[in-house]
Amino acid sequence: MSTSKTLDHNKPFETSQTQMGFALIHQNTSANTTTTTTTGERRGRRSKQAEPGRFLGVRRRPWGRYAAEIRDPTTKERHWLGTFDTAHEAALAYDRAALSMRGTQARTNFVYTPTDVHTILTNPNLHSLIVSPYNNNQSFLPNSSPQFVIDHHPHYQNYHQPQQPKHTLPQTVLPAASFKTPVRHQSVDIQAFGNSPQNSSSNGSLSSSLDEENNFFFSLTSEEHNKSNNNSGYLDCIVPNHCLKPPPEATTTQNQAGASFTTPVASKASEPYGGFSNSYFEDGEMMMMNHHEFGSCDLSAMITNYGAAAASMSMEDYGMMEPQDLSSSSIAAFGDVVADTTGFYSVF
């Protein structure tokens, strides 16, 4: 009996132990679950989250500027992209470099359409002008800093500045051609010059000035030369009439006003006529065009002494005269003929 009582007395103790043990185990499991949840929350807090104001490949300098750089995935090297005034400009520079390296697979700060990516790859200078289609915020554009647009994107001005009309040549440039002296084997196209559209407003004044200047530089035509042989002015008192012959060949041009001019040909210009060159007589005719024409009879009273001396000289004397003989005191004192070293003479 005693044994049975002792056994019955021991049973509730065992059950209590078992209950207590179960309770302890249950408490330990709950404690383990609470510890795991708390540690998981701590780990989540420690993980770095993307800040809303930061961009990929952009760092802020202590003095306020933003630096952009990118890492090449093939060579594992960092490429410096430059420093910018704002973070948006640096982010745009990073996106341009990333798209050029990786194409559409690149991670960018902004979202781009395929057309934008193609435009950036073909012309990187236009990258700052592209607006992100999925973001209406205009702050992504570097519109607040025009210095960036000028320094890093030189083509910005070509697309946004109004095109100025091309300047035409001023109308006062071409009249300088009227002061050119005639060159042999070269015809002067005065008619084309007078009909140019740039000189349509000043044709009247230019034609008059051209007539006066060309009358000085050019000689007469062959017909007018034959008519003026008898009224040659001062040349009758110095040169015999047989020497005053028209040039064999001449090229004529006409201007807008209708006046004709001749350009002497160099083939026979150097052939002497009795010691005198052909250019001497042409220069004499050019000088007499701007003066009044006087006949030889009008000057007969002035050249009586020289006419007697010229009549006594024969044709052979003129043919044998040297250019040095013409610079004698009797002729040089008249003040019209000056001898050159080359044998050509000019009248002042």
Swiss-Prot record:
Keywords: Activator, DNA-binding, Ethylene signaling pathway, Nucleus, Transcription, Transcription regulation. The keyword Iron-sulfur does not apply. It comes from the Eukaryota. Pfam families: AP2 (PF00847). GO terms for biological process: bract development; ethylene-activated signaling pathway; floral meristem determinacy; floral meristem growth; flower development; lateral root morphogenesis; negative regulation of lateral root development. Disruption phenotype: Disturbed cell division patterns in lateral root primordia leading to the expansion of the proximal region of lateral roots. Short lateral roots in young seedlings. In the shoot, formation of small pin-shaped protrusions at the base of pedicels. The keyword Nucleus applies. InterPro entries: AP2/ERF_dom, AP2/ERF_dom_sf, DNA-bd_dom_sf. Belongs to the AP2/ERF transcription factor family. ERF subfamily. This is Ethylene-responsive transcription factor ERF086. The gene is ERF086.
